[in-house]
Structure formats: structure tokens, C-alpha cells
A protein has these predicted regions:
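Substrate-binding pocket helix/loop in short-chain dehydrogenase/reductase
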Residues: 98-99, 103-111, 201
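Alpha-helical segment proximal to the catalytic Tyr-Lys
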Residues: 127, 171-175
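Conserved glycine-rich cofactor-binding loop
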Residues: 13-15
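C-terminal substrate-recognition "lid" of short-chain dehydrogenase/reductases
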Residues: 134, 212-236, 241
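Conserved glycine-rich Rossmann-like NAD(P)H-binding loop of the short-chain dehydrogenase/reductase
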Residues: 27-44
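Active-site helix of classical SDR
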Residues: 122, 158, 166
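Residue(s) in the substrate-gating loop at a strand-loop-helix junction
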Residues: 142
Length: 242
């Protein structure tokens, strides 16, 4: 159902985003890979998509927290691909710290990238979706946004905000045939999470192990193609938030 469509993936040069790009490309979607700073990594991802999946793939450097930069990037994607039908908002950062010692700039940076960046991309992509008469948006939130997490008040707040944004966008855009859902990963083994083998929270995961980036990518693929699902938050967490 994604063959020949164009998917835009933010934070697509590594980790969960990279896995999502490969999954969508394997389904036949052309991919626009948005990255923050590592051009070589983004181009490596695109080259693999072209070589192994035979799809069009281009990379775009963009600070999604910048409203104007996001607008310019979407305009360039439109010029390159003509349209787009899929948006996966995966770009995210952490600036962990105890609340009493957290710097204002660390709180703002996380909210700006994780929450405002997602708003910026949805805001500028909506026009493409309306003209295409279809659209599937998937926002990558976190179980931290559902449960909270000590030392991550900024990150948890940003991810909780994504859940509210997802449901509001779903209600607003449903009459136009545009769906919006979210995936809430738990402990996923990536370069962003680092080595968590000694984290006591792992003992609370009913399945007894960390997830993999491909587990999240599979959930995204489902939501992209599930034409009668909108406004939902799909947990991929091994049962930790039950």
C-alpha cells in the first residue's frame, strides 16, 4: 500500500529513524531523509535505499525546531518528489537532569526539537497531504510521556505533549482523509539509549529484554497502512506500561 508513495522521515540517519526509513523503502516508498548534522550518515542511508530497494531517496539537512527551516525543507521535498503522503516525526533529543538542577536551555531545547519540531513538520506537510487527498502521520513519542521518568522532566513533557498533539491533529484532519497516530517505544537498543543493561527498570519489562529499532519500524509500517486507525498510541515497550 506504500509502493510509489513518498515518505518523509525526520531523524532518519540513525537508530530508530534509520530502521523506519529502511522499512518504508522495503515497502516500495520513496524516502526523504531529514537529518540534523551528519550528512554522511544520511547519504549512506539513502544510498542503501536506492541500491537494495530500488526507490528514490534524498537527504535533507534541517533543524526541525526552526519553523522557517522546516517550511523550506518541505518546499524542497515538494520540488524533488512532487508530493508526499507519509510523514514520520522521529527527530528527538535528550538533555537529562534532575529537576532541581536542570538548566532552562536544556528544558527548552528538548521541547523545541521533540514537540515544536513535530508541530512544524505537520504544519508544513499538511498542504501536501490535502492536495494529495491522503496522508498518514506517525509521531514517535515514548512510554516516558505516559509514565513519566525521574531525571527526564523535559523529555517526558515533550513526549506527553506529542500524545495530545497526535490526538488533536487526528480529530482536525480526519475529515480531509488524513490520519495521525503515534508509536510509544519503551527501552529500545540504539546509540541514543546507550548501554542500559544495569538499569533497574529493565526488571519491570514483562518480556524481560530491550526492544530493537526494527520493532518500532514494524509498528510504524502498520500505522502507515492501517486506513481505519487514527488518533491511536501504539506502545512498543515489552509490556512495561501495562
Amino acid at each position: 500500500m506504500s509502493k510509489g508513495k513518498t515518505a518523509v522521515v525526520t531523524g532518519g540517519s540513525r537508530g530508530i529513524g534509520e530502521a523506519i526509513v529502511y522499512k518504508l523503502a522495503s515497502m516500495g516508498a520513496n524516502v526523504a531523509v531529514i537529518y540534523a548534522g551528519n550528512a554522511a550518515a544520511a547519504e549512506r542511508v539513502c544510498e542503501k535505499c536506492r541500491r537494495e530497494y530500488g526507490v528514490e531517496a534524498k537527504s535533507y539537512q534541517c533543524n526541525v525546531a526552526d519553523f522557517s527551516a522546516a517550511k523550506e525543507t518541505v518546499a524542497q521535498i515538494k520540488a524533488d518528489f512532487g508530493t508526499a503522503q507519509i510523514l514520520v516525526n522521529n527527530a528527538g533529543i535528550t538533555r537529562d537532569g534532575l529537576l532541581a538542577m536542570m538548566k532552562e536551555e536544556d528544558f527548552d531545547a528538548v521541547l523545541n526539537t521533540n514537540l515544536k519540531g513535530t508541530f512544524n513538520m505537520i504544519r508544513h506537510m499538511t498542504g501536501l497531504f490535502i492536495r494529495a487527498r491522503e496522508g498518514a502521520i506517525v509521531n514517535i513519542t515514548s512510554v516516558a510521556g505516559m509514565m513519566g521518568n525521574a531525571g527526564q522532566s523535559n523529555y517526558s513533557a515533550s513526549k506527553a505533549g506529542l500524545i495530545g498533539l497526535t490526538k488533536s491533529v487526528a480529530k482536525e484532519l480526519a475529515p480531509k482523509g488524513i490520519r495521525c497516530n503515534a508509536v510509544a517505544p519503551g527501552f529500545i537498543a540504539t546509540d541514543m539509549t546507550g548501554n542500559q543493561t544495569d538499569n533497574p527498570l529493565l526488571n519491570r519489562i514483562p518480556l524481560g529484554k530491550m526492544g530493537e529499532a526494527d520493532d518500532v519500524a514494524d509498528a510504524v509500517a502498520y500505522l502507515v497502512t492501517a486506513k481505519y486507525v487514527t488518533g491511536e498510541v501504539l506502545r512498543v515497550d515489552g509490556g512495561i506500561a501495562m
